[in-house]
A protein has these predicted regions:
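Acidic, low-complexity intrinsically disordered regions
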Residues: 1-156
Length: 156
């Protein structure tokens, strides 16, 4: 359904009740097609992920922090498959994603919601688990207003 509607992660959808119990109506917040600069996850030949700000065709309203374009869904599916049998620590995924996302702005700060959306591209993680991983790690600095910074990036 998401692909048929040309939706990306972070697209706005509306869920409405109906007269029938257990039945809901799901609709996308449609808008005229245009290209927007949004976070895009690219899958490298080595299976690594890279985030970049690229112009992508957008067909629905979206949350700027949550929206992530995924041009190579098959490559991302392969990453999910490869990771499924391994017990990868959330901490290592947080470092990897923070390292990638911090490249997208000059201060190298990463907003919690941006990180939450990026982490959920490669694993399903509830917000509280991610918040705990951020708040208990001395190598991650909270700089205010839900922004975080990797401690070693200040030494560049």
């Amino acid at each position: 359904w998401f692909e048929e509607q040309n939706l990306i992660p972070g697209s706005n959808i509306e869920i409405s009740a109906t007269k029938h119990p257990g039945t809901m109506i799901i609709s996308a917040e449609k808008k005229r097609s245009n290209k927007e600069w949004i976070k895009t996850v690219l899958v490298g030949a080595d299976g690594g992920l890279v985030f970049a700000l690229l112009r992508q065709p957008i067909y629905a309203g979206f949350n700027e922090r949550m929206a992530i374009a995924i041009p190579d869904q098959e490559g991302l599916d392969k990453i999910w498959q490869d990771r499924s049998g391994r017990n990868i620590q959330l901490k290592s995924d947080v470092f990897r994603m923070m390292n990638e996302l911090s490249k997208l702005n000059s201060q190298h700060h990463v907003h919690f919601v941006d990180l939450y959306a990026a982490i959920n591209v490669i694993r399903r993680t509830p917000p509280m688990e991610l918040l705990e991983a951020l708040s208990t790690n001395p190598e991650i600095i909270h700089v205010g207003d839900h922004y975080y910074h990797l401690a070693d990036q200040g030494k560049e």
